[in-house]
Amino acid sequence: MSTQSRILILNGPNLNLLGLREPAHYGSQNLEQIVNALTIQATALNVELEHLQSNREYELIEAIHNAYQRIDFIIINPAAFTHTSVALRDALLGVDIPFIEVHLSNVHAREPFRHHSYLSDKAVGVICGLGADGYEFALKAAVKRLRSN
């Protein structure tokens, strides 16, 4: 691990529409605002932050593969891929990088098909229903874990 920890933030499909799409579920902040706030927080915590949002499953998988031996922790909001992607699960398990799963909305208070996650049983933790604050809590938790190891 480098002297400065590196954390990768991954955001899945339709999160590029934050601020426009169903604000009652996802809030009014757009993704750029969320990432900017996280970047400020990461700087204050003395960690490097990388970010990728993609609507394409393979791009998220490639980012996970490229994180191997380069990234210390992943924070992922897989969005709709949460409920469908064995491939994302396998990629995360393959690189053996600890990760936290984040969801803006409380997926358990929504449609039944959103209740299952292919990732949560392998995640260090899951944060859902706290809006954009969930990312900030995940970043703090990731840094705390990295510093305690």
UniProtKB/Swiss-Prot annotation:
Its EC number is 4.2.1.10. It catalyses: 3-dehydroquinate = 3-dehydroshikimate + H2O. One of its GO terms (molecular function) is 3-dehydroquinate dehydratase activity. The record marks R21 as: Transition state stabilizer. Substrate binds at N77, H83, D90, L104, S105, R114. The keyword Lyase applies. GO terms for biological process: amino acid biosynthetic process; aromatic amino acid family biosynthetic process; chorismate biosynthetic process; quinate catabolic process. The active site is at Y26, H103. InterPro entries: DHquinase_II, DHquinase_II_CS, DHquinase_II_sf. Pathway: Metabolic intermediate biosynthesis; chorismate biosynthesis; chorismate from D-erythrose 4-phosphate and phosphoenolpyruvate: step 3/7. Keywords: Amino-acid biosynthesis, Aromatic amino acid biosynthesis, Lyase. Homododecamer. Catalyzes a trans-dehydration via an enolate intermediate. Belongs to the type-II 3-dehydroquinase family. This is 3-dehydroquinate dehydratase. It comes from Aliivibrio salmonicida (strain LFI1238) (Vibrio salmonicida (strain LFI1238)). The lineage of its organism: Bacteria, Pseudomonadati, Pseudomonadota, Gammaproteobacteria, Vibrionales.
